[in-house]
Amino acid sequence: MLIVEDEILPAMALRDELEDAGYHVMDLTDRHQEALAAARGRKPDLALVNIELQGHDDGIELARELKAMGVPVLFISGQVSRARSAQTVAIGSLPKPYSALDMVKAVDYLLRHQAGDESMAPPPGLEVFDETAPGLKPDPV
């Protein structure tokens, strides 16, 4: 798991909650280039990306680059309309404010969904965008 978030305290709380749930958070950053370097070093199963990052970095552009590397992205941003406008570069969005528990449920759902497990319903608040993104299988017809 890779967390790219400009607000350090919520990002640390999110990291702790995900790790308590059994996930490994490989890196926590607030910068575009640091996130890319981390993803190149060890490809994460999922990147949680805020749209507005430090130094005027753009999370949508980061998501585009991560997708090209085969890393699925979940937007974690209060900018719902911007997230929806960029749905081709992310697999979904969980808008702020969200609880750490909501995020764990969203991650559980997305990782199971990527593995083809359709037994879990998407948690409230999670908007799934492109079900044919890398690693995601389309729903059966």
Predicted regions span which residues?
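Conserved acidic carboxylate
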Residues: 5
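Acidic, metal-coordinating helix/loop segments flanking the phosphotransfer/catalytic sites
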Residues: 15, 28-46, 51
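A Lys-centered signature of the CheY-like receiver
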Residues: 96
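Receiver (REC) domain switch/active-site region of two-component response regulators
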Residues: 99
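Charged docking surfaces used in two-component/phosphorelay signaling
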Residues: 12-20
